Amino acid sequence: MASYTMKLSTYIEMWSQYETGLSMAEKIEKGRPKLFDFQYPIFDESYRKVFETHFIRNFYMREIGFETEGLFKFNLETWLIINMPYFNKLFESELIKYDPLENTRLNTTGNKKNDTERNDNRDTTGSMKADGKSNTKTSDKTNATGSSKEDGKTTGSVTDDNFNRKIDSDQPDSRLNLTTNDGQGTLEYASAIEENNTNNKRNTTGTNNVTSSAESESTGSGTSDTVTTDNANTTTNDKLNSQINNVEDYIESKIGKSGTQSYASLVQDYRAALLRIEKRIFDEMQELFMLVY
């Protein structure tokens, strides 16, 4: 029970006093945002909740050093704004100092030079012979067939008209009035008359059919043989002189864990370094609380 002011736990539990069955951690989480309802600098935003929870647990049963909780919160905010930039640098230096999962970091810089000279002399002799033979045979056969057909038809008509009159004239007893054959005059007398009148008409029809055909065949063949022989001899000489200058600059880095220390041990050492900084902060924040126990 507080003797002079109020305990920090009283302020924290005030925000969950009507809720039953809560654990201590749940009560602290309910009251934490109410206590730290202001902004202050922190090296890593994800570490803010961890830091605030550790602060409450460290001073949970301590009496605040001011008459009211409002005055306490004002001085708490002021202290964090003024002092946390310094402690943030300490936190950051621990992060920069090393990776918690590494205990070895080795950088090696080197220079290597390699000169190589090479002389090659190569003689190459070769020969080549090629024989070739070819046989060509040709055969040609040509068949030609042709035919022609001519059909003709002739039609004609012939008409003959003949008129003959023979007249013997003595002293006529009486006059006649006969028309001449050409119709241009008349005959007045005749002792005897003989007439022939002939009409002939002929129709002629002729048909001419001519068919002709022709067929020819020709056959030819030929054979040719060719024999070729090629001989070739080659001689080559290759000379190669080479000089290689190789300069190598290298940087070798080895980073990781070596030795028998486990990763769990490395992480534990890293957390211990952060807790040591927190302990320094909480030691200096004693001035915000009553120095009675």
Swiss-Prot record:
One of its GO terms (biological process) is symbiont genome ejection through host cell envelope, short tail mechanism. It is found in: Virion. Residues 104-240 are annotated as: Disordered. Keywords: Late protein, Viral genome ejection through host cell envelope, Viral penetration into host cytoplasm, Viral short tail ejection system, Viral tail protein, Viral tail tube protein, Virion, Virus entry into host cell. Residues 174-184 have a biased composition (Polar residues). Residues 112-123, 130-140, 162-173 have a biased composition (Basic and acidic residues). GO terms for cellular component: virus tail, tube. Its main location: virion. Residues 196-238 have a biased composition (Low complexity). It comes from the Viruses. Forms the proximal part of the tail tube. Belongs to the phi29likevirus proximal tail tube connector protein family. This is Proximal tail tube connector protein. It comes from Bacillus phage B103 (Bacteriophage B103). The lineage of its organism: Viruses, Duplodnaviria, Heunggongvirae, Uroviricota, Caudoviricetes. The gene is 11.
